Amino acid sequence: MSVINCEEVKRDEFHTEKYYDSYNIFGAHIVTEDEMRGVRFTVWAPHAKAMSVVGDFNEWDYEQHKMLQVTEEGIWSLFIPHIEEKEIYKYAIETTAGDVIFKADPYAVYAEVRPNTASVVFDIKGYEWNDKNWSRKKKKKSVYKEAMTVYELHFGSWKKKEDGTLYSYREMAEELIPYVVEHQFTHIEIMPLVEHPYDRSWGYQGTGYYAATSRFGTPHDLMYFVDECHKYGIGVILDWVPGHFCKDAHGLYLFDGTPTYEYKDKDVQENPVWGTVNFDLGKREVRNFLISNALFWMRYFHIDGFRVDAVANMLYWNKEGQEQSNEHAVSFLRELNEAVFAEDEDFLMTAEDSTAWPLVTAPTYEGGLGFNYKWNMGWMNDVLKYMECAPEYRKYIHEKMTFSLLYAYSENFILPLSHDEVVHGKKSLLNKMPGDYWDKFAQLRLLYGYFFTHPGKKLLFMGGEFGQFDEWKDLEDLDWNLHDFEMHRYMHDYFKELIALYKRSKPLWQLDHSPEGFQWIDANNNEQSIFSFIRQGDKQEDALVVVCNFTKATYENYKVGVPDFEYYNEVLNSDAEQYGGSGQVNKKRLKAIQEPFHNQAAHVEITIPPFGVSILRPVKTRKGSKKQDGSKTKVRSNVTSRGKR
């Protein structure tokens, strides 16, 4: 990291212009000045009357190391010789009211372990990365036409040691990575790792945006974890919260005694539901702080994506009784995405947005927000409401399972079965399923079958892969002892087979963002709650037929229209005995009957399993293997900064 002397920086560059390297100026940097080694401290506090650096080195006496104000807009700086790495410090700020408050450094790259709140001098340089092969491979692929399976996890509660203590970043590399590789997830998505004071905020209420939380080790330890993920072909996505922050006294809130990082207007400053305050996204210094932060994580931690939290809260002012768009936030998000994709055109920028805001994943030059993925919250809500309904009443809400296909290609979507749906009394995915013990497992297998065959990339929260019975308990680890029970082992085996089938089946991901990748066979059988559809790849023979039965009834010799192939194999049946099912499976090879049905050229007669999904693959084409018009399917993408698609 090249440290810039703030006295040489034109004030306009930080206060009025785009300045995305602000971490090179601000914070605590180990430097040599006038042949003396020490630390230069620089901070922005526009309304402070006076500033000091305090720590053990001066017995926390704010009279000793007074900072100099170097711009009228409130940049303060001081070089202190003979201070070394690991020194703890804070800023003592004299407010306009005459009070002295003590604040952690907004740009600190390391902090004390909670409950302590001081910043720590740390030289973030020096980690030797070994992920060039990962970077080369990533550039050769188009994420839009690849399989994507994301394992969402909370670092502190995935697994704990026997004595209840937390695994470190390095220890988690040894524990987590083999597990992720075994399950063939392509990415992990980690709930926020920025420094935060309260464990139960899960990291979403941060105080140190540049500091990887010290709960699990040093910044270099986290770099090692990411490096190891890349070594084994796993991408790393971080939850990132640029919309709001916590009100703890040592953090960003009222940083110099006045609203500094937050809006001044109380009507839009406060988030009463979360007890947080909103970043003032119309302020250039705040934008530079946040966009520099995004690039900092990309450059120094080599992460592969952000899941941007609470975008809906950013897009609209939270004034009671009003729904007015926040143009500051809209402009900020576009600027953020342009900066990110200029840095790395293969990066993942995912919006967690529950609104109907248009063009979230369209490039900014087309009027979009510039993300390249968006969580499909509508799909998640509809599907889970449908699954929680008693099977005999599902026919009355049939449209909840078909509505998503009306808008599935309006954005680049990720289908999230996330942490938000298995906490706060919402029950685990398994326990959402109605019926008896067997029914619950059968329906969860069915849900996963539908999940992996529906258009869109995939995200699953930890524990879902083996059927966690209890909802997520953030102060405990997962119920790993459930592997001692047969039905959970069956579920785990099924999930691994399903994700393996997904990854090796191009029709399930190659045209995720093109309408040509999906065709209903029968979307209207509400009486039996059976859905059938085709997933299609680039080539005609790359096709799968999917049949889902959302009741407990079994149907024999059930006619399903299919494309004109000669034979079909059943490549997966969720009711197979090896997955804990009743064994209502189909013989391996099914001959297609050359009589039209369901607007298809042929049909097969199959057994429809109870609460089951059957996936069929064509064995042999009757004529050719190319699309009739010889064209190549176009897939929607977002390359915000490149001026092309």
From Swiss-Prot:
Quaternary context: Monomer.
Record's GO cellular component terms: cytosol
Pathway the protein contributes to: Glycan biosynthesis; glycogen biosynthesis
Gene: glgB
Protein name per the record: 1,4-alpha-glucan branching enzyme GlgB
Taxonomic source organism: Bacillus cereus (strain AH187)
Domain of life: Bacteria
Catalytic activity entry: Transfers a segment of a (1->4)-alpha-D-glucan chain to a primary hydroxy group in a similar glucan chain
Function: Catalyzes the formation of the alpha-1,6-glucosidic linkages in glycogen by scission of a 1,4-alpha-linked oligosaccharide from growing alpha-1,4-glucan chains and the subsequent attachment of the oligosaccharide to the alpha-1,6 position.
GO biological process: glycogen biosynthetic process
Residue ranges that the Swiss-Prot or TrEMBL entry lists as coiled coil: none
Protein family: Belongs to the glycosyl hydrolase 13 family. GlgB subfamily.
PANTHER family in UniProt: 1,4-ALPHA-GLUCAN-BRANCHING ENZYME
Known EC number: 2.4.1.18
Taxonomic lineage from the root: Bacteria, Bacillati, Bacillota, Bacilli, Bacillales
Pfam families to which the protein is assigned, alphabetical: Alpha-amylase (PF00128), Alpha-amylase_C (PF02806), CBM_48 (PF02922)
Gene3D superfamilies referenced in this protein's UniProt entry, alphabetically: Glycosidases, Golgi alpha-mannosidase II, Immunoglobulins
CDD domains noted in UniProt: AmyAc_Glg_BE, E_set_GBE_prok_N
Keyword Phosphoprotein: no
Polar residues composition-biased segments: 636-645
GO molecular function, one term: hydrolase activity, hydrolyzing O-glycosyl compounds
Keyword Glycosyltransferase: yes
SMART domains the UniProt entry points to: Aamy (SM00642)
Keywords: Carbohydrate metabolism, Glycogen biosynthesis, Glycogen metabolism, Glycosyltransferase, Transferase
Active site: D309 (nucleophile), E352 (proton donor)
Disordered, as annotated region: 619-645
